[in-house]
Amino acid sequence: MMDLKLRKDFLADVETAVVSAERKHPKICDNFCTKSKEDIASLLKIRQYLNDKAEGNGSSEWYEVIREEVLEAVEAFNVGQYKLCLQELAQVAAVAVRGMEFVYRLTEEYKAREKFNGGKSD
């Protein structure tokens, strides 16, 4: 598990990115998704099957997991389940932060910190 201070730093980075995105793309959501409900349901079913299979093989990838979460959010939106859509979008954000944590572990800063802590991971 990642150090909570680092996770807060990542969330602060996300907040900064949101502010920047609001300026850069002020009308980002004129439409949430223009694909049909049927197309989204089909894409989601396929993605869930592939992700379940990958997890069973121990070969799950971040990119595929976040795609599934996005599709789940769109599906909820398409059927008018807005509270569920918000929950799914929170899961998208959680998977994005987990991706940040994964990449951080590849940085020299993390490696130096781990070495300083006697090889103990965050």
Q: Over which residues does each language-model region extend?
A:
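Flexible "arm" and connector segments at domain edges
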Residues: M1-D122
